[in-house]
UniProtKB/Swiss-Prot annotation:
Substrates-to-products reaction catalysed: (2E,6E)-farnesyl diphosphate = (+)-5-epi-aristolochene + diphosphate
Organism: Nicotiana attenuata (Coyote tobacco)
Pfam families: Terpene_synth, Terpene_synth_C
Lyase as UniProt keyword: yes
Protein's UniProt name: 5-epi-aristolochene synthase 1
Length: 548
């Protein structure tokens, strides 16, 4: 606890100030500018490599296994965004031809790729690899690549895919047993997959790992694809670093580190979050808008969680609902700073989008922010009053405070293809969005439980679950893990065709769930304490380029 005088208040106010660590990055990203000569050189070299890759994709007379492996390699190398139409047409043909084979490894890869692209291929493709008791044949245990593909395929399962529950257990136990005895780079690939499956990984993180740690070391690598991937990664990294420099200057100008020292200084980690939602160059404007939004809502979150008093937070909540700069005089000085910054930010968004005659869509994000703040206030009231709600009441409020309804809506703002219908669909909290939100909530709650408990927070998801069901901490955490697994099945179902909106928009919701899985891996809070979890990823994506 700490005492502080706020605004014109003469009395001392006791505040539950959290002791957050400072930024790991200082001014490291502040002054980057693209070397246009190098960027131009990379771009020119990419063009013929791109056409050679397209020719590989469109070549005819190839075996099914070779086609699937080529697509998988292109996707893992992070260059598939150039060939979305071609890849979709090839997979559509494979799906409609009911292309089938008796090869274990190829069947598993076919299943995963088709499911990830929205084709509802039947899990019965695996029945031929089972014995008379419906168990996977033990003879498959010697096919490590097949096991790896089966393991990766098991993570795209839906509620109807019971066979894939067995596939996950079977592949996991045999891969864990085989891993120590494998040669490089297969050993590294298996070890990495067991810690972070491909489907739930952040695409850029997985790409960097695959290029540097796996594909470069493979004897059968295609040097055209490898060079293309390296050049493209480095070229995109220049754009990403330029965006981060722009955002870092914006953040430094706001000077929240000085004026709001109680809050987490995590603008670089916020950029990583936005980069996880979309990395492609066409989303540059959307990415910058999203990272600013995440940074701002993080300040608001810490204001409610770690600083504000009941009276102040009620006034702040009311001011946000009214969304009027004239409300600012009702607030203590420190709240005026963030309130003005929020309103200014959304005015900037409206200006940015006015050239495309889309400034009117900003209202969707504003309404979502009002919703989040209202729920933050409920949460802070529970904390201050020492109220522990039933788990159902807790979740109805806590799902909104993940900010994921809000961030999903904001992530659409800068997308040129977003229509009013897309925002309307999103506003109804479709099942796939609800699932992404649930994943965020239960994984966050599990990772932050001990810290929140030590701060005297009793209305945590785990505590509410323990009390409602009369179970231990371990069992409550297992129950939350089961909720996350169920939600992943909902996401996977939501990606299957026909879909109510384009795959482009569904992928953003999928990526939001992926970021949570990565940020809170091993029950660590990688956002609040980025040293162990996010720092290595940030260095790989935004500091170190790939040696060409």
């Amino acid at each position: 606890m700490a005492s502080a005088a706020v605004g014109n208040y003469e009395e001392e106010i006791v505040r539950p100030v959290a002791d957050f660590s400072p930024s790991l990055w200082g001014d490291h990203f502040l002054s980057f500018s693209i070397d246009n000569q190098v960027a131009e050189k990379y771009a020119q070299e990419i063009e013929p490599l791109k056409e050679q890759t397209r020719s590989m994709l469109l070549a005819t007379g190839r075996k099914l296994a070779d086609t699937l492996n080529l697509i998988d390699t292109i996707e893992r190398l992070g260059i598939s965004y150039y060939f979305e139409k071609e890849i979709d047409e090839i997979l559509d043909h494979i799906y409609n031809q009911n292309s089938n084979c008796n090869d274990f490894c190829t069947s598993a890869l076919q299943f995963r790729l088709l499911r990830q692209h929205g084709f509802n291929i039947s899990p019965q493709i695996f029945s031929k690899f089972q014995d008379e008791n419906g168990k996977f044949r033990e003879s498959l245990a010697s096919d490590v690549l097949g096991l790896l593909n089966l393991y990766e395929a098991s993570h795209v399962r839906t509620h109807a895919d019971d066979i894939l529950e067995d596939a996950l257990a079977f592949s996991t136990i045999h891969l864990e047993s085989a891993a120590p005895h494998l040669k490089s780079p297969l050993r590294e690939q298996v070890t990495h997959a067991l810690e972070q499956c491909l489907h739930k990984g952040v695409p850029r993180v997985e790409t960097r790992f695959f290029i540097s740690s796996i594909y470069e070391k493979e004897q059968s690598k295609n040097n055209v694809l490898l060079r293309f991937a390296k050049l493209d990664f480095n070229l995109l990294q220049m754009l990403h670093k330029q965006e981060l420099a722009e955002v870092s200057r914006w953040w430094k100008d706001l000077d929240f580190v000085t004026t709001l020292p109680y809050a987490r200084d995590r603008v670089v980690e916020c950029y990583f979050w936005a980069l996880g939602v979309y990395f492609e160059p066409q989303y540059s404007q959307a990415r910058v808008m999203l990272v600013k939004t995440i940074s701002m809502i993080s300040i608001v979150d810490d204001t409610f969680d770690a600083y504000g008093t009941v009276k102040e937070l009620e006034a702040y909540t009311d001011a946000i609902q009214r969304w009027d700069i004239n409300e600012i005089d009702r607030l203590p000085h420190y709240m005026k700073i963030s309130y003005k910054a929020i309103l200014d930010l959304y005015k900037d968004y409206e200006k940015e989008l006015s050239s495309a005659e889309k400034s009117h869509i900003v209202c969707h994000a504003i309404e979502r922010m009002k919703e989040v703040v209202g729920h933050y206030n409920v949460e802070s009231t529970w904390f201050i009053e020492g109220y522990m709600p039933p788990v159902s009441e807790y979740l109805s409020n806590a799902l909104a405070t993940t900010t994921y309804y809000y961030l999903a809506t904001t992530s659409y703002l800068g997308m040129k293809s977003a229509t009013e219908q897309d925002f309307e669909w999103l506003s109804k909290n479709p099942k796939i969005l609800e699932a992404s939100v649930i994943i965020c909530r239960v994984i966050d709650d599990t990772a932050t439980y001990e810290v929140e408990k030590s701060r005297g927070q009793i209305a945590t998801g785990i505590e509410c679950c323990m009390r409602d069901y009369g179970i231990s901490t371990k069992k409550a955490m297992a129950k939350f893990q089961k909720m996350a697994e169920t939600a992943w099945k909902d996401i996977n179902e939501g990606l299957l065709r026909p879909t109510p909106v384009s795959t482009e928009f569904l992928t953003l919701i999928l990526n939001l769930a992926r970021i949570v899985e990565v940020t809170y891996i091993h029950n660590l809070d990688g956002y609040t304490h980025p040293e162990k979890v996010l720092k290595p990823h940030i260095i790989n994506l935004l500091v170190d380029s790939i040696k060409i």
